[in-house]
């Protein structure tokens, strides 16, 4: 149920005044279709652990993938069968089939076949190609044939998430000789995340989240991370009990061109005649011109070392007298050169 909130209460400050990373960086040094290292910073203290652990659980449990769910082997009625001229018994073959990693390029389940003549190993790559099924680990051995017999099997490939025990499958849907298999659907093989400190200006009390993801190749690591974030977002939306647009502050309708025409933008911040404390804070933050200053938000200014609410109010009052405000985007504005400043 949507709750009405008093518009006079600036509840938006709860999320507006938290620092937020602009993007997720990808470490390209070892990046591949199966491995990715991602860096997200800066985050508020404690947020890296919260986000890192939440995404890790979702990555391992909820990202969908494809797996073999049933097998029908010619000459075998059940999983305890031993087959002539096959080194492994059916139970061992089933264990090997569980490790086959696949990519399913359609929504419906698919049936694929193996027809391999011995002697020699039968590998995942011997599965007859299909337009919708792609084998990711083709060298994976399924069994070994000791004669020139032909090994024939029919496999069912389905979508799913997490782990599905064989006994959970509907027995009424199985045909004679069709054996259900424990299915490992998750395409994510390994996840590791590290939380360290991040610096913003002179402050180091922020978090840095470094994520390493390894997949089976059916899903790219960056896509798996994106899907997990989407799942988390969808699950959390239900907790927001107010109209988000109604509580956001009104954006001042100021055209960029009008702002850029303001003559004060090219003036040095010394012209503001600030207090010594405020002036030193701007100098330490490498804010030299008023055009630099107005592009900073309230939140960014308050993160500056030794810069407090009193200094912020002082600056906002002076900018208001110039018909300027903080948090303005100036596209195409560049700080004047030394020669221009002298003129």
From Swiss-Prot:
Q: Which UniProt keywords apply?
A: DNA-directed RNA polymerase, Nucleotidyltransferase, Transcription, Transferase
Q: What is this protein called?
A: DNA-directed RNA polymerase subunit alpha
Report which superkingdom the organism of origin falls in: Bacteria
Which E.C. number(s) belong to this protein? 2.7.7.6
Q: Which GO terms describe its cellular component?
A: cytoplasm; DNA-directed RNA polymerase complex
Concerning SMART domains, the annotation shows: RPOLD (SM00662)
State the organism of origin.
Answer: Desulfotalea psychrophila (strain LSv54 / DSM 12343)
State the Pfam families in the record: RNA_pol_A_bac, RNA_pol_A_CTD, RNA_pol_L
> Which family does the similarity line name?
Belongs to the RNA polymerase alpha chain family.
Catalysed reaction per UniProt?
RNA(n) + a ribonucleoside 5'-triphosphate = RNA(n+1) + diphosphate
* Positions of the UniProt region annotated as Alpha C-terminal domain (alpha-CTD): 261-343
Subunit organization: Homodimer. The RNAP catalytic core consists of 2 alpha, 1 beta, 1 beta' and 1 omega subunit. When a sigma factor is associated with the core the holoenzyme is formed, which can initiate transcription.
Q: What does this protein do?
A: DNA-dependent RNA polymerase catalyzes the transcription of DNA into RNA using the four ribonucleoside triphosphates as substrates.
Q: Where is this region: Alpha N-terminal domain (alpha-NTD)?
A: 1-243
């Amino acid at each position: 149920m949507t709750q009405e909130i008093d518009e006079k209460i600036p509840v938006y400050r709860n999320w507006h005044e938290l620092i937020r990373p602009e993007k997720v960086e990808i470490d390209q040094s070892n990046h591949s279709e199966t491995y990715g290292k991602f860096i997200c910073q800066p985050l508020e203290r404690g947020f890296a652990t919260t986000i890192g652990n939440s995404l890790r659980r979702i990555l391992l449990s909820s990202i969908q993938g494809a797996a073999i769910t049933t097998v029908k082997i010619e000459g075998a009625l059940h999983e305890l069968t031993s087959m002539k001229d096959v080194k492994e018994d059916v139970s061992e073959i089933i264990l090997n089939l569980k490790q086959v990693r696949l990519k399913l390029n359609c929504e419906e389940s698919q049936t694929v076949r193996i027809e391999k003549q011995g002697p020699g190993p039968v590998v995942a790559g011997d599965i007859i190609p299909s337009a919708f099924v792609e084998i990711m680990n083709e060298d994976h051995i399924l069994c070994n044939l000791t004669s020139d017999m032909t090994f024939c099997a029919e496999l069912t490939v389905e979508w799913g998430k997490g782990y599905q025990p064989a006994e959970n499958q509907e027995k009424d849907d199985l045909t004679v000789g069709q054996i259900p298999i424990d299915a490992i659907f998750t395409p994510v093989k390994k996840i590791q995340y590290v939380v360290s400190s991040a610096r913003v200006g002179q402050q180091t009390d922020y978090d840095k989240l470094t994520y390493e993801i390894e997949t089976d190749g059916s899903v790219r690591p960056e896509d798996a991370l994106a899907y997990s974030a989407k799942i988390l977002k969808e699950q959390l939306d239900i907790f927001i009990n107010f109209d988000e647009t109604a509580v956001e502050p009104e954006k001042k309708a100021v055209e960029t061109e009008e702002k850029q025409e303001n003559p004060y933008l090219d003036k040095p911040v010394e012209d503001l005649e600030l207090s010594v404390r405020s002036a030193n804070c701007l100098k330490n933050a490498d804010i030299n011109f008023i055009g630099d200053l107005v592009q900073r938000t309230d939140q960014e200014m308050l993160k500056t070392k030794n810069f407090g609410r009193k200094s912020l109010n002082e600056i906002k009052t002076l900018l208001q007298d110039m018909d300027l405000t903080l948090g303005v985007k100036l596209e195409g504005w560049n700080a004047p050169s030394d020669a221009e400043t002298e003129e």
